[in-house]
Amino acid sequence: MTESRQTRLQVKCPTCQTAVVWKPENAFRPFCSQRCKLIDLGGWADGKYTVSSQTESLPEISEPDMAYR
């Protein structure tokens, strides 16, 4: 099947919102360019983005529990 016959998936660049065709030849996907990719990386490095997680409290371990068995 040729590319013109296939449905081409388009996504928006997370940085500049430009339409980007999702294909293996696009080395920067989902970004439109190296510049947008680096801007996003800089945002992560600056702490602008975070990944939330639920922290579970660890069970208390007493000294007898830590003894070798």
Curated annotation (Swiss-Prot):
It holds the Pfam family YacG. Binds 1 zinc ion. The keyword Transferase does not apply. Zn(2+) binds at C13, C16, C32, C36. GO terms for biological process: regulation of DNA-templated transcription. Keywords: Metal-binding, Zinc. Gene3D superfamilies: Erythroid Transcription Factor GATA-1, subunit A. Its cofactor is Zn(2+). InterPro entries: DNA_gyrase_inhibitor_YacG (IPR005584), Znf_NHR/GATA (IPR013088). It comes from the Bacteria. The keyword Metal-binding applies. One of its GO terms (molecular function) is zinc ion binding. Inhibits all the catalytic activities of DNA gyrase by preventing its interaction with DNA. Acts by binding directly to the C-terminal domain of GyrB, which probably disrupts DNA binding by the gyrase. Belongs to the DNA gyrase inhibitor YacG family. Interacts with GyrB. This is DNA gyrase inhibitor YacG. It comes from Neisseria meningitidis serogroup C / serotype 2a (strain ATCC 700532 / DSM 15464 / FAM18). The lineage of its organism: Bacteria, Pseudomonadati, Pseudomonadota, Betaproteobacteria, Neisseriales. The gene is yacG.
